[in-house]
Amino acid sequence: MTNVRTPGIDGIDLDPPGSVGTRVAFFVLWGIDMVAATLFFVVPYATELNPVTVRFYELFGLPGVPLAAICYAGAVVAIGHLLSDPIDRRFVGAVVFAYLVFATNNVVLLLSGRSPLGV
């Protein structure tokens, strides 16, 4: 199955990366990870390790964390848009797997105070 091209702004064709299910999984896991990363700055027992997110937090405060997450999502969508099918599906699938690991680790850390990955 190929991606459906949709006419975009000024005649630019939009070619969303991956399948609809993969994109939904990406945005759900991305959202969970974004909330968890934001909570890392308000709980005393968890630390955000991503230096870009930490820098955005230092510059903009708590709103900087979702802003950093939005930048990450934008980068993933842009890269997926540039890749051809089926490589775009593989790329977004790999990102979904990474976010699955990150989100699971972060949620367990927030709920139990201990990281299952030992990070």
Regions found by a protein language model. Name each.
Residues 2-119:
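Hydrophobic alpha-helical segments at protein termini of multi-pass membrane proteins
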